């Protein structure tokens, strides 16, 4: 039987607003970004038609707020099947109308889940800089992989090559996929780039996923980094480097009393507080020195060029104190779930602080309205096994670290138990002609979604066929003698244990 590990779904509180999504986002979001985003969509036979339709609808909603085009965001869609299929590349659509129509026309490929071949195509033809139809130079590149988690293959190596080449990798899994594998392939931080969600609830991660993409491709023109008590590093995207002339005029000073950060108003004009520096056209950074500790500064950067008028950019930052306060101890900083079965899960948390914590309290209930259960754990333990759970059920779990003073720190997750997967009980194979066999089996289990048939067609070749749950027989052609033929039941989250015969 294929063993599937349980997935931990981060509990999200989402506020949904009615109305036109395009009208509900501000201009700062619409024009926030520049970058190339490729979506790798699992379109194989392991994905039910309903699930595929939900994934495409999710992409439509996810991408609707973005401005598209050569000066904004470009989007590509690569489908995973027996052979990868580039539905459309980065140059295909520069308007939401065209993109949305293309998504509506997208059809499922079915066939095998050949994710590795699709990744090789993505790296060689789509995400590579400088090739026709490829990514743009000097801009962020993002790969978002949407998968049901069934048989992804050995994706770690091709994903690692993409990350080494500067591609940010994000993953959305709608099934009980291998958490360890998916955690390895995403770009850090994992908590912002790896999403587990049931297909019926996929819309709840839309805002978080969009924000994660925006964080990577945001066209931040003016950024302040490496801030100390007396200095800061100013960085910007060079807009004069191609002109060969001009310079950057930089002004900075303490913010005026009553001035709101981020609102134009210029630096303070108090005597001795105003500073000005310039940098040549090919510059993209400047060091700001002579700053006062624990002070909020406003800085403006104006590109000067006789050939064109360019916008003045402004930002603000606060220098560090001379003796910054010691960071507070996190009583509870991480929470994870592992070793899931159909009726139990292991819950682990960190850090373990027996000198500060009196006890840990676990509260959990089945969603949406199951009875609340409470489990208390000693302050010397950082994990426990919760038993007597219902199979294929989502639970809302809260772990609280309680101090003797009465203060506490709590974290909440969604826990998903495994589905019970009955095995196939009978399989009969009979020959009905030259290289033609007929299969019959017994099925009709609760929760059955269909049957997965595989057979050998020659040396190192294998064919697959997905059948609906009401089919209990099929005829296969081109099955050589002594070929191995297998049938497995398919459930919502995984395949059950199948049976095999030899032709």
UniProtKB/Swiss-Prot annotation:
Annotated keywords: Basement membrane, Disulfide bond, Extracellular matrix, Phosphoprotein, Repeat, Secreted, Signal
TM ranges = none
- Keyword Isomerase present in the record's keywords: the answer is no
Concerning Gene3D superfamilies, the annotation shows: Immunoglobulins, von Willebrand factor, type A domain
Q: Entry's CDD domains? A: FN3, vWFA_subfamily_ECM
**Short name of one Pfam family:** VWA
Q: What is its main location?
A: secreted
Q: Where in the cell is it found?
A: Secreted, Extracellular space, Extracellular matrix, Basement membrane
Give the residue range of the signal peptide: 1-21
List the effects observed when the gene is inactivated. Mutants primary motor neurons have reduced axonal branching innervating the muscle fibers and secondary motor neurons have aberrant axonal structure. Mutants skeletal muscle show also an abnormal structure with disorganized myofibers and reduced synaptic formation at the neuromuscular junction. They show a progressive impairment of locomotor behavior and have smaller jaws and abnormal cartilage patterning compared to controls.
User: Residues in domain Fibronectin type-III?
Assistant: 218-324, 331-423
GO biological processes: axonogenesis; neural crest cell development; regulation of cartilage condensation; regulation of cartilage development; synaptic assembly at neuromuscular junction
Q: Which residues form the VWFA domain?
A: 36-213
Extract the InterPro entries matched here.
ECM_Assembly_Org (IPR050525), FN3_dom (IPR003961), FN3_sf (IPR036116), Ig-like_fold (IPR013783), VWF_A (IPR002035), vWFA_dom_sf (IPR036465)
What do we know about how this protein assembles, alone or with others? Answer: Homodimer or homomultimer; disulfide-linked.
Checking PANTHER family in the record gives: COLLAGEN ALPHA, VON WILLEBRAND FACTOR A DOMAIN-CONTAINING PROTEIN 1
What's this protein's name? Answer: von Willebrand factor A domain-containing protein 1
Give the source species.
Answer: Danio rerio (Zebrafish)
